[in-house]
Amino acid sequence: MRFLLGMAWSLLFSVVFAVLAARYAPLRRVILPFVNFMESVPLVGFLTFTTVYFLNLYPHSVMGLECTAIFAVFTGQAWNMMLTLYQTLRIVPKELDEAARSFNYNPWQRFWRLEFIYSVPGLLWNAMVSQSAAWFALVASEAIPIGDRSVELPGVGSYIAEALAQQNVPAILYAIVALAANIVLLDQLVFRPLVRYTARFKYEDVTANRALGNPWFYNSLAFSHVGAALGRTLRALADLWLFKLPRLWYALGLHRLFRLAAKGNWLWRSLWYLGVVLACVWFGYRLWEYFPKQYFAMLPEWMLLTTARVAAAMLLSVAIFTPLGVWIGLNPRLVKIFQPIIQILAAIPPNIFYPLIAAFIAIYHQDLGWWAIPMIMLGTQWYVLFNVIAGVSAIPTQITEVSETFGLRRFRWWRYYMLPAIFPYIVTGIISAAGGAWNSAIAAEVIQWGSTTLSATGLGAFISVVTDAGKNPESALGCAAMCALVALCIIFVWQPLYRIAETKFKYD
């Protein structure tokens, strides 16, 4: 239930803020850096402060902890889903937009009947990959350290925390089985039917979808009275949402309010930027007063070490899983086989595997510093793989036919056809992987298995240690340092890549 509520809030957030970012440049200049920034903020940074907020909001009630867990699921899904929806809204083919305008669609109908529909396949795929981050967040949020004690909610997360503390390997295996069962049920009852249904929204020849099989639950709904009743209900809701509400809106003359407000765009832009600057100055001053100053001299070295591990993990993930994702995505049969397997592996929290790595390191006297790189990859590689598969699946059939006509092979096939076609999805994948990488770095640089603790020097280790000790000022300093690294990545890496993806690699 916590997972589903978090997913619902993530979808609502994605639609609202993706549309605002795609439509209004002043908002886009703030929303995109903010979302990229928040995506890479470590989960413990949210939990440290949101836990206190929700506990004070609902004193003497378990509702505060429930809200913390739901918000943790939200932070694991919302940023990735919003970025995907924004990306697809920006690359809607011009001929489709011109066709919608020729049918005299109003802006409301144009969004829901064209732009949102065009974005649904990619959004659904990223909702599936975001599921892994959501489970990671949910597991972490069901057992939260507060000071010298741990507050737990009933659930798989608290069960895993107890199993790790007791070094109980069978209990960890039971938790893996329970998570796998949940993921398989979601795949069979929700995601597979939705993937099959939304295949009709891909921008290509309808004959390209014939290779897709019909999942058993999709067939059950399609040929049942329940499915027919559900279809009638959805059609009635669509008629209300797409036609009756816009007619009421225009009948009441509410559209004139937007025209009136548009006349003062310069004023709203000025007030918006002024508000953003004042908020940044105020929060920056409060944080500076809150930070412990004795750690400043050591932060650059810690930041450099953790950044090197994260960068190495991300580059290896792209180099290894881009070819693998292309191989899977080109074959619908392989997608059908590997999709549930990848979902199960992706949704299993990486820290479950860390005790096995810790045992290996202890036995063979290895250095945790280098071993942290493959451990970080466990939390990043699935983002790249899912986005590459989504990108390959979304390539229009016409583009594929052109590449076959020119006889592209091997290196030329990658350079002139495949990599340009999936480049926007690779960009989304590595940005999403960055968020998972920073979270994984915190968990990977300090491993605890019962009474045994292994650690590597780095910013992630500092954040993990001070958070477990309940030192909020030190935790805030570590999270702020990690956020500074993220901000540098946004300015010098992610934004240039976004511009290239939007201008050079777009279907027109």
PLM regions and their residue ranges:
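Transmembrane alpha-helices
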Residues: P107-S141, Y174, A178, V190, ...
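Generic hydrophobic transmembrane alpha-helix motif, especially the helices
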Residues: N36-G76, Q343-T380
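C-terminal transmembrane helix and the adjacent membrane-cytosol boundary/short C-terminal tail
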Residues: A25, L173-W249, P332-L334, N472-D508
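Transmembrane-helix boundary motif in ABC transporter permease subunits
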Residues: L5-V35, A312-I342, P355
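Short cytoplasmic-facing helical segments at TM-TM junctions of multi-pass membrane proteins
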Residues: T84-L123, A127, N387-T428, I463
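Glycine-rich helix-loop "coupling/hinge" segments at transmembrane-helix boundaries
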Residues: F136-V169, Y203, N439-A476, A481-M482, ...
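Periplasmic/extracellular loop-to-transmembrane helix junction in inner-membrane transport proteins
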Residues: M1-A8, A165, F243-L316, N331
